[in-house]
Structure formats: C-alpha cells, structure tokens
Amino acid sequence: MRLGFSAVTAAVLDVSAAFRLAAELELTFVELSCDLREAAPVLHEPALINELRSATGIGVTVHLSSVDLNLASLIPAARRTSIDRTLRGLEFAHTVDASCGVLHTGLSYLPHPQAEALVGAALQESLSELVDSSVPIALENLCLTDFDFVRGARELRELTRRHGLRNCLDLGHAHIEGVREANDALGDYRRTLGADVVHLHLHDNDGLSDAHRPTGEGTIDYAAQAAFLHGFDGTACLEVTGGEAGVRASVAHLRSLPTPA
C-alpha cells in the first residue's frame, strides 16, 4: 500500500509542515481537505501545494467537502449548493493533481418510505453531475448514524458501479458498523467492493464512536488485516487524531505488522 496521512485530521494545518512530516516518515502522499480549503483558502494554496509536490515527490489525495453538505438533500437549493461545492472541490483536486477525491454519499432526515425514494433519486441526480471528473471519485462507506442514506456494502457497490465511480474503504467506519450489527462488516465491504476500492482510511476506535484514534489504540484487529494491507496497491490514508505524534505512532504500528509469508 502507498501510505499517507490526513493533515486536517492530525491538525497539521501548515501544509509545508505536513509535507515535511510526510517526507521524514517516507510517506507517499498528504490528504488535503476541501472543507479547510473553503473555510481558509490561504491554508491550501494550489501554487504552494504544487511547489511542495515538485520539491518532495510526495503526492496528494483530496477529501471533498462534507461539512454542511448533502448530495441527497430534498431541498433543491441545498442540493444545488452541495453539487457546486463538490464540483469546485474536484477542480481544486485536478489543479493539485490529486490521485483521488474522497466523497460522502448523503443524508436522509425523513424516515418515511416516500421520502426514501425521493432521497435516492436526489442522490442519483447529484452523482450524475460528477461523472465527468478528471479526478477519480472514491465513495466512502459511512453508515455511522441513522441519517446516513447508503446502508451497507451492497448498496454502496450498486451506487458506485451505476455511476462508474470507485471506493474509499474506511476501516474505522466498517468496524463500528460491524460491532453494531454483530457481523463482519469490514470483511463484507472488502469482498463486495473488491477492486473498486482504490483508497483506504485507516484509524482506530472502540467500535462505538468514530474517535479516529491512532491505529493500534482501539479494538480493530489490524494484525488480522495485515495480508490485505500489504497486498493493497492503492493509497492508504492515516486519518488519525493526536497531531504529529499520532501519525508517527500509526506509521510505526502499521510497519510493525507481520508480513505475510
């Protein structure tokens, strides 16, 4: 796997410092945040990012906006804003030559069968406006709350393939889903999504809350995932809290996992 880290989750907001840390730890990429780009553009200047990429040989991935964004909204103005923000994020990702853009799928706040059909149609329409992106879009598994519209691996696969997209497999999210449903959700996502998974989000938790702890500090059995991780040829982002120390600890932990025979 090609290992990198999320600068915003680790609270390394100085992009130059993020690239220095990635270079020191011999990581492959830094994951940038479109939410941060929108809120504080000076922190994610494309010209500086491209200078850093050229100087270090370190690439980037982009987490497309998720704050106050809902591609499945039943409110036309809210959904239009969400689409436009995502399109601007994809333009930013193209400018910095991101290898992929991670995207959340959408929320449904009305637990009613008629509303569910309308929400599904709204999400399909939103995604249809994104399919011409020059940057691969990786739909992420969520299923953390009752409001997350896409439920489980099969729904995510159907949505992904209908629009010719790819996937980001978040191990922490899958772990929470598996604990809640008392099943092997992580294994199900791996088997069901298969080669559509081009990007990983790696972090840890207790199976109850999405804490984004450094890997090895929760209840995810990373040793059981060692063969999968070693054989994965996409990008794998450490989406961990704890600042630089959390990133360092996670890198050391993952590199200590046994190499399959």
Residue ranges with predicted function:
Residues M1-R88, H94, R166, L257-A261:
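N-terminal pre-domain/capping segments
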Residues R2, S16-A23, A98-S99, V150, ...:
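Histidine-acidic metal/acid-base catalytic patches
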Residues E45-L48, P76-A78, A117-L118, R154, ...:
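Short low-complexity, flexible loop/linker segments enriched in glycine and/or proline
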Residues A72-N167:
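Active-site acidic/histidine proton-transfer and metal-coordination neighborhood
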Residues V8-V15, S33-A47, N70-S73, S108-P113, ...:
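Acidic-and-aromatic substrate-binding clefts and catalytic sites of carbohydrate-active enzymes
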Residues I49-S65, A122-S133, R161-H163, Y222-L229:
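Alpha-helix-loop-beta-strand connector modules within alpha/beta enzyme cores
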